[in-house]
Every structure is written in C-alpha cells, then in structure tokens.
C-alpha cells in the first residue's frame, strides 16, 4: 500500500455524479515542495480549507462540462 497523502481543499468547483452525490474540488498537497494541485471528486460534505487524506495522489478527475 502506498503512503497516505494529505491535501487541502482550495476551491469547490461543483457537484458531479448522476444524482449530484460527489463534489469536484481542487486540492493542494500539504507536504509537496512544488505546491502541486489537482482536481479530485469527493463523496460527502466538503468545504474550502478541509484536509483530505488521499490514498491515491496521482489520479486526477475529469473536469465538469
């Protein structure tokens, strides 16, 4: 199992999923030297400033249309 990665939610982009059950957010990695940020889909309540524990840090979600 890969190591866990902490990421901070910087922007809530919108709702996604067939019934709007997921939220698409932009996250910035906390321990990364390059201030890398990616877009992820999050299930459950989330808002800006929340800290997420990502099991997979390389996967990025497709953008909303």
From Swiss-Prot:
GO-annotated cellular components: cytoplasmic side of rough endoplasmic reticulum membrane; cytosolic small ribosomal subunit; ribosome
Intracellular or extracellular location(s): Cytoplasm, Cytosol; Cytoplasm; Rough endoplasmic reticulum
Disulphides: none
Protein name, as recorded: Small ribosomal subunit protein eS28
Keyword Protein transport listed: no
Family as reported in the entry's similarity comment: Belongs to the eukaryotic ribosomal protein eS28 family.
Assembly, per entry: Component of the 40S small ribosomal subunit.
Primary location recorded for the protein, binned into one broad class: cytoplasm
Origin: domain of life: Eukaryota
